[in-house]
From Swiss-Prot:
Protein localization: Cytoplasm
SMART domains: AAA (SM00382)
PROSITE patterns: RECF_1 (PS00617), RECF_2 (PS00618)
Function noted in UniProt: The RecF protein is involved in DNA metabolism; it is required for DNA replication and normal SOS inducibility. RecF binds preferentially to single-stranded, linear DNA. It also seems to bind ATP.
Location, primary (coarse class): cytoplasm
Coiled-coil stretches: none
Organism of provenance: Allorhizobium ampelinum (strain ATCC BAA-846 / DSM 112012 / S4)
TM segment ranges: none
Protein's recorded name: DNA replication and repair protein RecF
NCBIfam families: recf
Signal peptide annotation: none
One GO MF term: ATP binding
Length: 374
């Protein structure tokens, strides 16, 4: 069984609607209840900032600081992490009218937020993700890349470096600057990064599909079949170096077409995640709203189990309004699955009774307009 990581103290300053708030926890699950708009999701967003990226809302830093705050926001967490007891601090400060993120680990400044993954992995499911299967391919790519990032912390850096190189190429092409050697250098970089991204996605999906096949519980949460489409689909099993050569040559041959289009038309940024309901053999987007929600929960739980298997440590789960659309049986099954994972889960809802079956497996916290009480 995976070892547990858990937060035992959380402190927020000038974060969203929290002027100053502190919460002491004991390692059990955490249920946050309160009226809509009281700050439940804001607190979970703060926890999500203990991982690389822009948090569960993908927020701009300047929007996160409390209105009227003198400077930026700060988040402090003490936790039992993957490397033992650790104190994490992150927040923002304004430099030249621009909000910049800062990070400290055990009081020492750290340059890269990727170092957070040495101490914990954080996964989340929010109501904003309910339209994942019917929404845009860019939303599914973002979802997929967060799944990859949880087991391959370098994936985010590769993705940002690829985007940077692609923007440089697009700029040269849009300006009509067809400098062969310059473009060739950029395209070589894009090929190496793009294929590495694609292979990391495929490997994560292979591992996840194998786990779903082994662990699926169709009576509770339906099984999902996963497939990638839109980039190098026809080259499965080809060596990475050959894939890089193929993509690099394709980029070189499509300069005129890409210049006319004003963007790069082929690459990992064009991939799409295709999901099918296994038991019904139906595309996820054609399933009912309830079936889509159950599919998504099943995917998140399977991925959490994969992270625990790959790292040896259970991730922290953030499940926003998770119980609202589940019947009593599925709620109980969900809570049991979370227990089996062995980690700490934060859950929100307006009615504490929805979580009654958790009993003493959870701490119940009341949230009232940015104020917390146990």
């Amino acid at each position: 069984m995976a070892e547990k990581t858990f937060i035992n103290r959380l402190q927020l300053t000038d974060f969203r609607n929290y002027g100053s708030a502190s919460l002491r926890l004991d390692g059990r699950h955490v249920v946050l209840t309160g009226n809509n708009g009281s700050g439940k999701t804001n607190l979970m967003e703060a926890v999500s900032f203990l991982s690389p990226g822009r948090g569960l809302r993908r927020a701009v830093l300047s929007d996160v600081a409390r209105a009227g705050a003198a400077s930026g926001f700060s988040i402090f967490a003490s936790l039992e992490g993957m490397a033992g007891d650790v104190e994490l601090g992150t927040g923002s400060e304004v430099l030249d009218e621009t909000a910049v993120r800062r990070l400290r680990i055990n009081g020492a400044s750290v340059r890269s937020v990727d170092e957070l993954t040495d101490h914990l992995r954080v996964l989340w499911l929010t109501p904003a993700m309910d339209g994942l299967f019917t929404g845009s391919s860019s939303e599914r790519r973002r979802f997929l890349d967060r799944l990859v990032l949880s087991i391959d912390p370098q994936h985010g850096r590769r993705a940002s470096d690829f985007e940077r190189a692609m923007r440089s190429r697009n700029k040269l092409l849009s300006e009509g600057r067809f400098d062969a050697s310059w473009l060739a250098g950029i395209e070589q970089q894009m090929a190496a990064l793009g294929i590495a991204m694609a292979l990391a996605r495929q490997e994560m999906m292979r591992l996840l599909a194998a786990l779903i096949e082994q662990r699926r519980e169709p009576e509770t949460f339906p099984g999902a079949d996963l497939m990638l489409s839109g980039f190098m689909d026809e080259h499965a099993g080809t060596a990475a170096i050959d894939l890089e050569d193929t993509y690099r040559d394709s980029l070189a041959g499509s300069r005129g077409r890409d210049a006319a289009a004003g963007r790069t038309l082929e690459g990992p940024h064009r991939s799409d995640l295709l999901v099918r309901h296994r038991e019904k053999d139906m595309e996820a987007e054609r399933c009912s709203t309830g079936e889509q929600k159950a599919l998504l929960i099943g995917l998140i739980l399977a991925h959490a189990e994969l992270v625990a298997t790959m790292t040896g440590f259970a991730p922290i789960l953030l499940l926003d309004e998770i119980a609202a659309h589940l019947d009593e049986g599925r709620r109980a099954a969900l809570f049991d699955r979370i227990d089996v994972l062995g980690g700490q889960a934060f859950m929100t809802g307006t009615d504490a009774q929805m979580f009654a079956s958790l009993g003493d497996r959870a701490q119940f916290v009341t949230v009232d307009d940015g104020h917390l009480s146990l």
